[in-house]
């Protein structure tokens, strides 16, 4: 453990409440699914309907590489030049990304994807487990900064138009049905192994409908001789707050139970792999007066004795810190106490 920092803040900006699905949206629209869907979920209806004129010429399924810089609309034809090959470059230990786009004029009942073998001319191979992919899913949002006055503060929802945007990368969903006149991006990542032999590797992303091949997309990855250290060795000071309370509520498990820690482990491992350095700990009940959908409680039990002295139980604090260290987040602990208002 490198450092312990205690915060007693007098002012703190809230990032706003994070509202979980509860069978209805924040605005009261039914979602048509359980309050806390696991593994997969239904997306909300798109307020923007497909254009009959725009889609009239699309009578089959189209597949192309896109760009990672664009969030492709769900029901608008993607504005791209069809591309069957994309080339990426990276150091050993670096993660490189690409985005493929599927759009179809006919229904696909079982859209899925897989990776072929990636080899260089000398027969060296990038292992299968270096590659991950996921369908890019869509969530509802509204206009950002419409009045030019920033996004914070009270705002009437009726004054801001709603739209569906591509946002989460769903690595749990392995296959999906795709209605006609719909766009579906696929996000691809290669975490180049530290042990990879420098060279240019060629392979394929296979887009299928069930067992029927729709398209082979060529992917070329050039591996440099340079090496990026492991995430826990990075100097970059990444501090994304964790909320164990939100995880317990969403997965409907008792707080600080073994089921709770089991639910948190894959989430916190992803955070560790991103280079997270800080463990978020709270020492008092609602240290900033709630604000978030799942308020932060104390990880230390405060007990005032009959004689006026205080005793403190650090059991939960210790379990939380030890758990976070076990997934690889072990540089600092930021402890938040009371925020006076």
What is each of the regions a protein language model found here?
Residues 83-106, 186, 265, 280:
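Contiguous beta-strand segments within globular domains
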Residues 105-107, 191-198:
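Short, surface-exposed loop/turn segments at beta-strand-coil junctions that are enriched for proline
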Residues 22-82, 102-188:
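Surface-exposed binding patches on compact interaction domains or structured appendages
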Residues 1-25:
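Bacterial Sec-dependent N-terminal signal peptides
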Residues 160-161, 170, 191, 201-209, ...:
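Aromatic-lined carbohydrate-binding surfaces of glycoside hydrolases
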Residues 90-95, 179-183, 198-199:
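Solvent-exposed, conformationally flexible loop/turn segments
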Residues 98, 111-113, 186-188, 203, ...:
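Hydrophobic residues positioned within well-ordered beta-strands of beta-sheet architectures
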Residues 85, 175, 216-220:
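Well-ordered beta-strand positions in beta-sheet-rich domains
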């Amino acid at each position: 453990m490198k450092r312990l920092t205690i915060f007693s803040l007098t002012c703190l900006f809230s990032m706003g409440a994070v509202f979980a699905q509860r069978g209805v949206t924040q605005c009261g629209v039914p979602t048509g699914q359980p309050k806390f869907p696991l593994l997969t979920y239904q997306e909300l209806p798109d307020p923007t309907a497909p254009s009959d004129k725009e889609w009239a010429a699309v009578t089959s399924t189209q597949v192309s590489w896109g760009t990672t810089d664009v969030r492709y609309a769900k029901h608008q034809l993607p504005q791209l030049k069809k591309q069957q090959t994309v080339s990426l470059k990276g150091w050993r230990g670096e993660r490189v990304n690409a985005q493929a786009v599927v759009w179809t004029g006919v229904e696909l009942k079982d859209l899925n994807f897989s990776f072929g073998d990636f080899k260089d001319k000398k027969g060296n191979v990038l292992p299968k487990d270096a590659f991950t992919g996921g369908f890019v899913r869509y969530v509802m949002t509204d206009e950002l900064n419409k009045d030019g006055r920033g996004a914070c503060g009270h705002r009437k929802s009726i004054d801001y138009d709603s739209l569906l945007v591509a946002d989460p990368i769903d690595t749990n969903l392995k296959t999906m049905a795709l209605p006609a006149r719909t766009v579906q991006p696929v996000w691809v990542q290669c975490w180049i192994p530290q042990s990879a032999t420098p060279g240019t590797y060629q392979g394929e992303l296979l887009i299928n409908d069930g067992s029927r091949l729709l398209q082979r997309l060529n992917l070329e990855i050039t591996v440099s001789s340079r090496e990026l250290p492991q995430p826990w060795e990075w100097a970059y000071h990444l501090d994304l707050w964790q909320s164990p309370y939100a995880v317990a509520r969403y997965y409907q498990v008792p707080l600080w139970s073994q089921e709770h820690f089991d639910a948190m482990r894959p989430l916190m491992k992803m955070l560790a792999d991103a280079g997270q350095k800080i463990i978020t700990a709270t020492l008092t009940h609602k240290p900033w007066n709630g604000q978030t959908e799942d308020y932060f409680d104390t990880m230390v039990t405060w007990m005032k004795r009959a004689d006026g002295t205080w005793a403190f139980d650090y059991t939960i604090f210790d379990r939380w810190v030890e758990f976070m260290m076990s997934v690889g987040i072990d540089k600092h602990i930021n402890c938040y106490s009371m925020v006076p208002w």
